Amino acid sequence: MLGMSSVLAGLARFADPGGIVTGELAMTNPLDPALFRADAVTEDTRALNEILVKLLTPLPDWWVVGAANAREGRRRGNGPFPPPVMSTRAVVRSIPGREGHAIPLRIIAPENPRGVYLHIHGGGWVLGGADMQDPMLERTADKTGLAVVSVEYRLAPEHPWPAGPDDCEIAAHWLLDHAADEFGADRLLIGGASAGANLAVATLLRVRDKHDAADRFVGTNLLYGPY
C-alpha cells in the first residue's frame, strides 16, 4: 500500500518538467508479480484491513437506506470516517455543464502553482463529494506545488451514466482551455481513488479520443479502483 508521502512525491515528480517517467522506461520496469501474492501483504496492512472491515460491516447498504440518506449519514460522520473538515482556503467556482447545469469546481491552490491536478473523488459513483477531503487536497497542493481542482460531478442513481463522466470530461476540457490563464501553469495531471480513478481513466480516454489532447496530461495518480 502506497503511503501519502509516496503519492505526493510521485505527483511532484510529474509536475517537474525534468522528472517525467517516459513510457519506454515504464515498459522496462513491469510490476513484480510477487507483489500480488497473499504473503506480500504486510502485517500492518492486514491489521488496517481488519479495522476497516469491522467499521464497514455494520453499515447499511446505500441501496437499502437510499442514496440521499447514505450521503447525509456520511457527512454527519455515521460511518468509518468522521465528518468532513472544510478548508478555509477552498474556492468554489462553477463552469457550464453539457445539459445547462452548473458543475462546481473546488479549488485549493498554493502560491504560484507549477501545474494543475484535476482530482476526482471516489464513492462508488454514488457517494462522496468534492468537499469531503479538503485536508488531503491541502496537503497535495502544499507538498507538490500543484493547484488542486476537485470536480463535483453528478452522482448516480439520480444521474445515471454518462452524467458523471460527462462532467469530468467538461472539467478536463475547461482546464485544457483555461489552466494557463487561471493558474499561470498549463501542466496538467489527473487522478483519484476508487470510482475517482475509474473516472480519471475514462476522462483521459475521452480527452484522447474526442479532443486529441491526451498529451496535455503529463501524469496520473490512480490510487486504486476498477480500471
List each model region and its residues:
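Catalytic nucleophile-loop/oxyanion-hole region of alpha/beta-hydrolase
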Residues: 129-130, 136, 149-187
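Rossmann-like NAD(H)/NADP(H) cofactor-binding core
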Residues: 106, 149-151, 219
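Short beta-strand element of the alpha/beta-hydrolase
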Residues: 114-123
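Short beta-strand-to-loop junctions in surface cap/lid or active-site-entrance loops
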Residues: 105-115
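Primarily recognizes the serine-hydrolase "nucleophile elbow" in alpha/beta-hydrolase
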Residues: 170-181, 186-227
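A glycine/proline-hinged amphipathic helix-loop "lid/cap" segment
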Residues: 1-103, 107
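A fold-wide structural signal in alpha/beta-hydrolase
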Residues: 116, 145-149
